[in-house]
């Protein structure tokens, strides 16, 4: 998406080797036609898909130093009226996808023993919920807590965990 690609360009401008993961095959093919870096089709909601992608990254680059976890879908509705299926889908997209990537990255970073960084796109919804955005905000609030928990659990390994609020970006996520 928009935020992910802009983040990619910024990291490339600093000389980083960057790998893009996306579940949207059409978008991924479009990106691959524009850039020379590794793009991997991956459903980050699926642990096996994440493990396969991270194995491919490690085979090409030898490890992972920074994870930028940017998955998300803006699912809205009044929280007392949305179906359980919608709420569960939002937690898969906006929380478990991040947990799947972070837990796999942590395994790699610990083996590398050279520190590391987890960076989560959290959203203002985690701290300032908006009307009818509960299905999006609740998993983003859980993601903020997850980010803090990784910092507590893995800081002693030199692995940092931080979150960003990419607010006011016209990415198309909200329309």
What do the PLM-derived regions correspond to, one by one?
Residues 3, 97, 126-129, 134-142:
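The catalytic Tyr-X3-Lys active-site helix of short-chain dehydrogenase/reductase
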Residues 1-18:
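Canonical Rossmann dinucleotide-binding motif of NAD(H)/NADP(H)-dependent dehydrogenases/reductases
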Residues 63-64, 109-123, 156-159:
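Active-site loop of short-chain dehydrogenase/reductase
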Residues 102, 139, 147:
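Active-site helix of classical SDR
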Residues 73, 80-100, 119, 143:
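Catalytic Tyr-X3-Lys loop
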Residues 51, 55, 74-88, 107, ...:
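Conserved mid-core segment of classical short-chain dehydrogenase/reductases
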Residues 63, 144, 154-170:
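Conserved Rossmann-fold SDR core element
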């Amino acid at each position: 998406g928009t935020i992910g690609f802009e983040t990619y360009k910024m990291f490339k401008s600093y000389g980083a080797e960057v790998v893009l993961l996306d579940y949207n095959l059409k978008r991924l093919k479009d990106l691959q036609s524009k850039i020379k870096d590794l793009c991997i089709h991956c459903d980050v909601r699926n642990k096996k898909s994440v493990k396969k992608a991270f194995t491919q990254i490690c085979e090409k680059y030898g490890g992972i130093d920074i994870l930028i976890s940017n998955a998300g879908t803006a699912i809205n509705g009044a929280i007392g009226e949305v179906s359980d299926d919608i709420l569960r889908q939002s937690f898969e997209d906006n929380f478990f996808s991040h947990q799947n990537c972070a837990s796999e990255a942590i395994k790699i970073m610990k083996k590398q023993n050279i520190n590391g960084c987890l960076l989560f796109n959290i959203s203002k919804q985690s701290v300032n919920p908006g009307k009818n955005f509960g299905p999006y905000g609740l998993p983003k609030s859980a993601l903020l807590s997850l980010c803090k928990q990784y910092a507590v659990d893995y800081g002693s390994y030199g692995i940092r965990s931080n979150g960003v609020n990419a607010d006011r970006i016209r990415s198309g996520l909200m329309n």
